[in-house]
Every structure is written in structure tokens, then in C-alpha cells.
A protein has these predicted regions:
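Conserved catalytic core of two-component sensor histidine kinases
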Residues: 50
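Amphipathic alpha-helical dimerization/coiled-coil segments
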Residues: 88-124
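Key DNA-contact positions within bacterial/archaeal DNA-binding proteins
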Residues: 47
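Short, hydrophobic-biased segments on the C-terminal half of alpha helices
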Residues: 53-54
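Basic, amphipathic "hinge/linker" alpha-helix immediately C-terminal to the N-terminal HTH DNA-binding motif
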Residues: 68-86
């Protein structure tokens, strides 16, 4: 795990951010987010989800209850909201590039860009 040397915080990778966004998006439709629903959303295995959830819990971005329900902490929710704001801004800017994209393609591209930006550039 890399540390952000200036702040002593653990670095968040693209994968971490994709999981946080997926948990946030699932939680919009249901109160109880499960490992299975995360695996389905991301198209990954349950063991992969378990490994990532442990990493996110170590970063205090989520909690997992005894019976498997997953919830974002305040810090996890704040991270998801920041990413969501950046995605919305990118969704507005991408069409200005003059390339024809469908709404779904714009959303996917905006998400990909938002999670790929360096830690310093994550606020678009």
C-alpha cells in the first residue's frame, strides 16, 4: 500500500474508487448492499470483493456488518460524492469535444476519467 507522504493517508487506486462508486450507486436503490451485489455490479468474483472490502475497511471508507451488509462511512460517502460531482462535470464537458457519444458512453467515459485522475487532480 502506498501512502500519500504529505498527509500520511493511504493512496486510493482506480480499483478502490470503482468499488466506492459501485457501493454508492447500489445504495441509491437499496439500503442493504451485499458483497454479492457488488460482485454483480462490477463483474468480479466474490473473493475479489472480499479482498477489496478489507482494503477499504482498513482505509476507514466502509464498514461491513456481521451478516455481510456493507455501508460507506462518512469518509467513504464523501469520496463517492466528490467522484460523482467530478463525473457530472465531465459529462458536461465531454460533448464539447465535438465527438459523438451516446449518453451511456459519456457516463462510462466520465467515470473512467474521474477514477483515473491523479490524487492531486481528482477535483475537476
Amino acid at each position: 500500500m502506498k501512502e500519500n507522504s504529505e498527509e500520511g493517508q493511504l493512496y486510493l487506486t482506480e480499483a478502490h474508487l470503482n468499488y466506492i462508486l459501485s457501493i454508492y450507486e447500489i445504495s441509491k436503490n437499496t439500503v442493504d448492499v451485499s458483497s454479492c451485489s457488488i460482485a454483480r455490479e462490477l463483474g468480479v468474483s466474490k473473493p475479489s470483493v472480499s479482498t477489496m472490502l478489507s482494503a477499504l475497511m482498513a482505509r476507514h471508507l466502509l464498514v461491513k456488518e456481521r451478516y455481510g451488509k456493507v455501508y460507506l462511512t462518512d469518509a467513504g460517502y464523501a469520496t463517492a460524492m466528490r467522484l460523482e460531482r467530478n463525473i457530472k462535470k465531465l459529462e458536461e464537458k465531454i460533448p464539447l469535444m465535438g465527438i459523438s457519444f451516446t449518453d451511456d458512453e459519456i457516463r462510462k467515459l466520465a467515470r473512467m476519467i474521474a477514477v483515473t485522475l491523479s490524487e492531486d487532480d481528482r477535483d475537476v
